[in-house]
Curated annotation (Swiss-Prot):
Native organism: Mycobacterium marinum (strain ATCC BAA-535 / M)
General function of this protein: Catalyzes the reversible isomerization of glucose-6-phosphate to fructose-6-phosphate.
One of the record's GO molecular function terms: monosaccharide binding
A biological-process GO annotation: gluconeogenesis
Tagged with keyword Zinc: no
Polar residues biased stretches: 527-540
Compositional bias ranges of the Basic residues kind: 544-554
Region of interest: Disordered: 527-554
UniProt protein name: Glucose-6-phosphate isomerase
Pathway listed: Carbohydrate biosynthesis; gluconeogenesis; Carbohydrate degradation; glycolysis; D-glyceraldehyde 3-phosphate and glycerone phosphate from D-glucose: step 2/4
Length: 554
């Protein structure tokens, strides 16, 4: 498919109309009734993928809903689009690129020919180079300019070059075992870099500058400031031993002072938000080692193979993506809460925000025509139990429908006994997980509350309406492989929704104009003379006020 080819409007198909009529039929049927009518759904509406046990029974769907959603996916040719992606077809139509993040986790003996090259060989050549480098770093063979071993790596990137590594490093902190810690700088706000470097020793710090083009404004601004910090302490010659690059622009990397032997590349068929398992993950590999990083990749591949081969009726990413679409397009939900009951996954929701919102936040279909329905889910969330004391009130008793994903683990990485000595703190955490999904689904009626002797005036305030849907994802333990499985599970949900909506989930033109305008405004707010008048009165007034408060001519 190219962008010039017309895409059928999915909302004008019989499959869409069948779902609309089905919604009218089941209406606001409560999950209490749905479970009463189908008591085995808690066992039947589950799927196991790798180490992930996924329970989607607490959704406002029936078995007929699932059948109709699968019909919709087949009407949109989801399986054909999926096969094209895995084969390396240029499904990113607006940029005429293949979409091959799945190739980043193919085993070494696999073969995938794209544009005349076996990309698996290229992928593993980079992985081998990353492994050799991080082995030297972790063993102490690689030292800084003074001969001291490196103890801290600072990743400088933004967007996909930051959100993924930050999230994964925190999630897998227990696998960092070589005396190397990682820190991350992304924001061009100088407070980010200053706070990160405040207690570091230049002699034991290594910077990883992650920018495909090596021209990203925020990243290069931070990298230049970090280089100044280093050279002020150790001299210009130290740069080659304290900076490496993740980039494809050899000339600019060399101009910066980084030895191009220490440049780790990737490809234009890897989008930033899908790149944490590429060389962008170098900081993660430095911390956890090449073996654990290989386990991380193997987890992705497990779910990739499931998505590639499983029938849609039992295909976890496809089903969850279609259920998300059901809420977005037929029940009016605008967001999804991601609620990991693991503090190590504190950054998972932020990571998924870029994955889904940059991918599917589109109002134009791949053929250039306007979409005819809402697209894109707004992801947000915090770890349990923190969220319970912040925003769960709205989930339980508010007027907005917010489907939620609960993610938990049977075996904790850390645990402590409770004061009472019964069970452990992890057991307490997970009892909250199970309780919240149960109360969201089934609630508590006015009659039940009144029967407890609650004053009549208070009863309405304590009613828990229920009928609030959720997915429960349970794994044994948070390991590198399990984390890879979780990420791939959401990647393919995003793909599923994008195909049905007919959009290009792999471009991001919406971020470009703001960057261009920022470059144009920088000399306006910094020039010595009176600034050029802006095209609108609001921006003009803001610029002039800022200049005045900075001591420049208004």
């Amino acid at each position: 498919m190219t962008s010039e080819q017309s895409i059928p409007d999915i909302t004008a198909t019989p499959a869409w109309e069948a779902l609309r009529k089905h919604h009218d039929q089941i209406g606001e049927t409560h999950l209490r009734q749905i479970f009463a009518d189908d008591p085995n759904r808690g066992h039947d509406l589950t799927v196991t993928v790798g180490d992930l046990y996924i329970d989607y029974s607490k959704h406002r769907i029936t078995r007929d809903t699932i059948s109709l959603l699968v019909d919709l996916a087949r009407t949109a040719n989801l399986e054909a689009h999926r096969d094209q992606m895995f084969a390396g077809a240029h499904i990113n139509t607006s940029e005429d690129r293949a979409v091959l993040h799945t190739a980043l986790r193919l085993p070494r003996d696999a073969e995938l020919i794209v544009d005349g090259r076996n990309v698996v060989e290229d992928v593993h050549a980079v992985l081998d180079a990353m492994g050799d480098f991080t082995d030297r770093l972790r063993s102490g063979e690689w030292t800084g300019a003074t001969g001291k071993r490196i103890s801290t790596v600072v990743n400088i990137g933004i967007g996909g070059s930051d959100l993924g590594p930050v999230m994964v490093y925190q999630a897998l902190r227990h696998y960092a075992d070589a005396g190397i810690s990682a820190r991350f700088v992304s924001n061009v706000d100088p407070a980010d870099l200053i706070a990160t470097l405040a207690d570091l020793d230049p002699a034991t710090t290594l910077f990883i500058v992650a920018s495909k083009t090596f021209s990203t404004l925020e990243t290069l601004t931070n990298a230049t400031a970090a280089r100044r910090w280093l050279t002020d302490a150790l001299g210009d010659a130290a740069v080659s031993q304290h900076f490496v690059a993740v980039s494809t622009n050899r000339r600019l990397v060399d101009d910066f002072g980084i030895n191009t032997d220490n440049m780790f590349g990737f490809w234009d068929w890897v989008g930033g938000r899908y790149s944490v398992d590429s060389a962008i993950g170098l900081s993660v590999m430095a911390a956890i080692g090449r073996e654990a990083f290989a386990d991380f990749l193997s987890g992705f591949h497990i779910v990739d193979e499931h998505f590639r081969t499983a029938p849609l009726e039992s295909n976890a990413p496809a089903l969850l993506g279609l259920i998300g679409l059901w809420y977005s397009n037929f029940l009016g939900a605008q967001s999804r809460a991601v609620l990991p009951y693991s503090n190590d996954l504190a950054r998972f929701a932020a990571y998924l925000q870029q994955l889904t919102m940059e991918s599917n936040g589109k109002s134009t279909r791949a053929d250039g025509t306007a979409v005819t329905t809402d697209t894109g889910e707004i992801y947000w969330g915090e770890p349990g139990t923190n969220g319970q004391h912040a925003f769960y009130q709205l989930l339980h008793q508010g007027t907005r429908l917010v489907p939620a994903d609960f993610i938990g683990f049977s075996q904790p990485i850390d645990d402590l006994p409770t004061v009472e000595g019964t069970g452990s703190m992890h057991d307490l955490l997970m009892s909250n997980f199970f309780a919240q999904t149960q109360v969201l689904a089934f609630g508590k009626t006015a009659e039940e509350i009144a029967a407890e002797g609650t004053p009549a005036a208070v009863v309405p305030h304590k009613v828990m309406p229920g009928n609030r849907p959720s997915t429960s994802i349970l794994a044994n333990r948070l390991t590198p492989s399990v984390l890879g499985q979780l990420i791939a599970l959401y990647e393919h949900q995003v793909f599923t929704e994008g195909v049905v909506w007919g959009i290009d989930s792999f471009d991001q033109w919406g971020v470009e104009l703001g960057k261009t305008q920022a470059k144009a405004l920088l000399p306006v707010i910094t020039s010595d003379g009176s600034p050029q008048r802006q095209s609108d009165s609001s921006t003009d007034a803001l610029v002039r006020r800022y200049r005045t408060q900075r001591g420049r001519t208004g």
